[in-house]
Curated annotation (Swiss-Prot):
Protein's name according to its UniProt entry: ATP synthase subunit c
Family: Belongs to the ATPase C chain family.
Lineage: superkingdom: Bacteria
Organism, scientific name: Orientia tsutsugamushi (strain Boryong)
Residue ranges of the TM segments: 9-29, 51-71
Function (record text): F(1)F(0) ATP synthase produces ATP from ADP in the presence of a proton or sodium gradient. F-type ATPases consist of two structural domains, F(1) containing the extramembraneous catalytic core and F(0) containing the membrane proton channel, linked together by a central stalk and a peripheral stalk. During catalysis, ATP synthesis in the catalytic domain of F(1) is coupled via a rotary mechanism of the central stalk subunits to proton translocation. Key component of the F(0) channel; it plays a direct role in translocation across the membrane. A homomeric c-ring of between 10-14 subunits forms the central stalk rotor element with the F(1) delta and epsilon subunits.
Taxonomy of the source species: Bacteria, Pseudomonadati, Pseudomonadota, Alphaproteobacteria, Rickettsiales
Length: 74
């Protein structure tokens, strides 16, 4: 195979990193909604932890996207 085709295959596999980040954020907010339904008085602490976790999960997706763009144009 041509090395350029390997590059495009690697870019396609980086989409799995973005999909994993989306699933992670969905899982975090699903757990947040279940936790708020069980204990509404702890909403402030739960929201802080969920937003930090969602930010970290989304950062992994952004890193994967940036690496895919860099690989595509180099």
């Amino acid at each position: 195979m041509d090395p350029i085709s390997f590059k495009y295959i690697a870019i396609a596999f980086m989409a799995f990193g973005m999909a994993g980040a989306a699933l992670g954020v969905a899982s975090i907010f699903n757990a947040l909604m279940n936790s708020i339904a069980r204990n509404p008085s702890a909403i402030e602490d739960l929201q802080k932890a969920a937003l930090i976790g969602a930010g970290l999960a989304e950062a992994m997706g952004l890193f994967s996207f940036i690496l895919a763009i860099l690989l595509m144009f180099t």
